[in-house]
Amino acid sequence: MDTISDVMKHCVPINYDDYDPLPADHFSTYPVFCSKATAEAIEASAEFTRKWKRACEVDGLHQDKLNFQACTTHLGHYNQWAYPDCLPERVSLNAVLSDCAFFWDGMSPVTGRSTNVMITSPVDVSDSISAEKMNELTQDFGIAMLSELQSGRRIEPRFEINKMAVQVIRDFIAVDPFTGIGHLKEWKGHLDAQEKSTHNNMSWEKYVEHRVNESGGNWGISVGCWTNDIRISDEEKESVKYLTQLACAGGILGNDYYSFPKEFDEHHRSGTLDRLQNGVALLMREYGYTEEEAKEIIKKEVIIREKKWMDGFDAWSRQAGPETGEIRRYLVMTMALMSGSMFWMSHAGRYHRTDLATTAEDRATLIGKSRGALRVLAGYPPPKNLEGIVREPLASAVQDDNGHVQHKDAVADSSVRNGVHHAFKKRNSRNGKQNGTEGSKSTFTNGNYVQPAKLQQHGTSINSMAIYTAPFQEAAGDICDAPYSYIDSLPSKKNRNKLLDLLNDWLQVPPSSLKRIKNIVHMLHNSSLMLDDIEDASALRRGQPATHTFYGISQTINSANYVYVHAVHEVTRLYNPDADELRNLHRGQSLDLYWRHHARCPSMEEYIVMVDNKTGGLFRLMLRLMTAESSISRPLDTALCRLLTLTGRYYQIRDDYLNLASADYESKKGFCEDFDEGKFSLPLIHLLSHTRYPDRITSALFNRKPGTNLPYEMKRYILAEMEEVQTLAYSQDVLKYLHEELMHALDETENRLGANDGIRMMLLGMGPKLLLC
């Protein structure tokens, strides 16, 4: 405690005697601190709220549907506890930033994500503005903000509330450009991460992992670096990431605890309960706990993580030297953010609502509504009312060698995920399926072969010859589909679907055809990923094991080919079943494989040809299919075709760069994985063209035992060589130049086809400014 207090300069430990009544629902064990500048924060929030309401009136946003509850509560201000050590001169702007983020984000309709105190608004989002209006507001804000950041081009927003929001961010960056830009990078990363997955049919461990990655925790921490003027490098952050993730996990689960009734109410009224993402809901749905049981588990999990953080911080402090002072401030700020947020949530009106339309009985309908088997939570007793929600009597359950309860019928095929066992398999599902397999499939009972039901109908028996002349029976598809189903379940941003929707603003493809094109592109993309991972010998895909590590190379290839054939069949059902771009995809991949097999470094010109066919081919396929199906009769637009070709190049070169320079990419694919693959990426081609010792590099890359990764020390050597010849700097220059050309190509396309704010915001959002900062 002394070590933590010594770091604080502008706050004091909270005096609980100052609060009457005390928040009865506060259970966090962290020390809580209070800013000395609370009055300034409250005053700034009040003034900003008045201006925001006036802006909403000008923009035609109905006040009766926007319940503005700012950071201020009856006990004080959110920031006085969450950012207690904020520099005095930054208190007012920080309060405005918090309210701006809360209000602006809070107008969004329910989207399926779990709200988080560090990024969302204390407003009733289920009664907020329409999705169409919110999309218009988002594009207006995004184009104005990203244009200024990426190209220095100042575009004034059309909406008054966006003018206020953009000005707040301008002021934020002007005060401290270093931490201000870092904050925007984390904000964008948070928004990107939210789009990757939902949490249905997910284990508790996997849920916590995903929430840490996709929540606003890192965004809130980046704001704390700005408020406290903390200067810390990415390497220093990485060295204590285990502690910041512990803190974030506790804060996220605390938010789930307090926000569950409100979130359930919002999703219930909007008809999106299947998209409710909350730890309490997950424990009820996937594990069968009651709301009270689930909340007690959440409490324990929060306290466990808080104790681990305190112990970990003490251990770190004992071995940390005087040069780690800034890291110490960073860690204490992170803890204070979670501690203060927990104190605020324990009494804020946002969570302690009396106007909810739903009741505890309504929330109880979630219990046991998993998509498959109920799970068993390691370290906790089973739900007390388990007998009342399972589809089979508990008496038929058995225990495995680890003491986990499982149903007899599920033992043979139960899976273990992160130590949590699938148990209590549901039976008698539709279409004759049982436990996820066709009812007619062959099985073994007591070591004896049991024939499919259809064969038994023909009077066959174990010793009968009739099975050899029985009618044709189509094989079940589940085994062939399994590898594809696995990769399809992995988190994804679904950028291609978004791009298709945005292109449709220009091309006007009928809904049924657009749906088929999306399915074609989705199947082709996932099929190519399965094959790419085999051809590249990749162990990871999107941070998870690659498909072939589970299903083997042969079965994965078979599944990928099966899906590819199905995609081609879907293409033939469209008006223009031209397969040119499908051929180009394979020709591009063949170049990549040929260069690797023969260890031949291509020229930059050859590299671009490969990219245009392999990566750009899928983009052009999307365009050609949509043009053929368009309700607007026009030939393939050359400007739009060029735009998508440049987009494919930018995607690939950005991917090449991130493979070597991004910590996030490293966590998903491994450290410099392109070196393991022997892939001739743009950085490697540049290095081999400029280093004095190209033979050393190629010898290390291509004279290895098959299936072995390049040693870590050799990867560091290659990176050092790249540093010497400025390879990564060159890659950055290429990205900057290519992005400028992308925006020029977009200008030309809009001149021909009309404005497309959605595509403009997408291209601005993937620009190099936030990528390279």
Swiss-Prot record:
Reactions catalysed according to its record: 4 isopentenyl diphosphate + dimethylallyl diphosphate = (2E,6E,10E,14E)-geranylfarnesyl diphosphate + 4 diphosphate; (2E,6E,10E,14E)-geranylfarnesyl diphosphate + H2O = preaspterpenacid acid I + diphosphate
Positions with biased composition (Polar residues): 431-447
Region described as Sesterterpenoid synthase: spans on this chain: 4-359
Pfam families linked: polyprenyl_synt, Terpene_syn_C_2
Region of interest (Geranylfarnesyl diphosphate synthase), residue spans: 360-769
PROSITE patterns xref list: POLYPRENYL_SYNTHASE_1 (PS00723)
Sites where the protein binds Mg(2+) 2: 105
Binding site for dimethylallyl diphosphate: 541, 614-615, 652, 659, 669
InterPro entries according to UniProt: Isoprenoid_synthase_dom_sf, Polyprenyl_synt, Polyprenyl_synt_CS
Record: residues binding Mg(2+) 3: 532, 536
Gene Ontology molecular-function annotations: geranylgeranyl diphosphate synthase activity; lyase activity; metal ion binding
Renumbered residue ranges of the record's region Substrate: 211-214, 259-263, 350-351
GO biological process, one term: mycotoxin biosynthetic process
Disruption phenotype: Abolishes the production of sesterterpenoid.
Residues the record lists as binding substrate: 105, 255
Summary of the function given for this chain in its UniProt record: Sesterterpenoid synthase; part of the gene cluster that mediates the biosynthesis of aspterpenacids. Performs both prenyl transferase and terpene cyclase activity, converting isopentenyl diphosphate and dimethylallyl diphosphate into geranylfarnesyl diphosphate (GFPP) and then converting GFPP into preaspterpenacid I. C22-oxidative modification of preaspterpenacid I by the cytochrome P450 monooxygenase sttB then leads to preaspterpenacid II. It has still to be determined how preaspterpenacid II is further modified to produce aspterpenacids.
PANTHER family reported for this sequence: GERANYLGERANYL PYROPHOSPHATE SYNTHASE
Family: In the N-terminal section; belongs to the terpene synthase family.
Protein name, entry field: Preaspterpenacid I synthase sttA
Gene (name only): sttA
